Amino acid sequence: MIDSQPVGGGDVNQAFKLTTTDHQQYFLLMHPSDSKNFYQQEIVGLQLLGQTAKVPQVLANGMWGADAYLLLSYIASQPFGDQYALGRGVGKIHKRTSQNGQFGFNVDDPEGRTTDGGVWYPDWQSFFINERLEVRKRIIMNRHLWTGAMDARYQKAVAHFKALMKTHHSTPSLLHGDFWSGNFMFDENAQPVIIDPTVFYGDREFDIGVTQVFAGFDNEFYQGYQDEYPLDDGYQERLPFYQLYYLMLHLGKFGMEYQGSVKRLLRSLA
């Protein structure tokens, strides 16, 4: 190796672009951990998504001193690319479903974005409420950022979600699980590359709802998705509940700056 250059690795990992003496380039993620399996969830996710979409190739993982590491192929990127192709690609991913016909996943996410692996439910409504919303709520309560007024609106929002789900059939699709604009990029040919997954099997509207929380997806993305795998009637009413989950995740992780957004969304859903 002749060069190690720090690059953005998200809010959890240290990340480096490595260049070797023969000019090969690699992407290295590192995180303090006592387990060589720290990145197992991401590895499995990349392997699953890579059967349908372009993703970084997993080259090696293990321990380096007191840090877990994950070595990936390096993909040169550019800021703009084919969002229509991105939408179609996500639609193709969502067409893949769980082998057992249930909702969940079987590998832990050590970064805390999801629940423990090995949790499966026969219905999406119960999985989403128990393993997503309620988990986030407990974390927020432990940080003393959950008020009585928020809880009253939350209970009404959950009842509203249950009512909407009575007329919607959920299929356990393969999901990225954390699909905001920081988790895709475009290669040198302007083609989409999917990164940093937290995969599980769930209703595909979950991923689409998350895309709408922060900027980064344009109309071409949604058109591409609809052309590949049209969303079911009434999806506009259901997407805000997945936005609520994602904002609750950020409130529990990053603190007070997201409380106002959660409160406003709860008011609109109650």
Predicted feature residues:
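ATP-binding pocket architecture of kinase catalytic cores
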Residues: 5-126
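Short, solvent-exposed loop/turn segments at secondary-structure junctions
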Residues: 33-34, 63-66, 75-77, 133, ...
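A general structural signal marking secondary-structure boundaries and capping sites
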Residues: 53, 94-101, 140, 165, ...
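An alpha-helical support segment within catalytic cores of ATP-dependent transferases
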Residues: 98-174
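Short helix/strand-capping connector loops at secondary-structure junctions
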Residues: 241-250
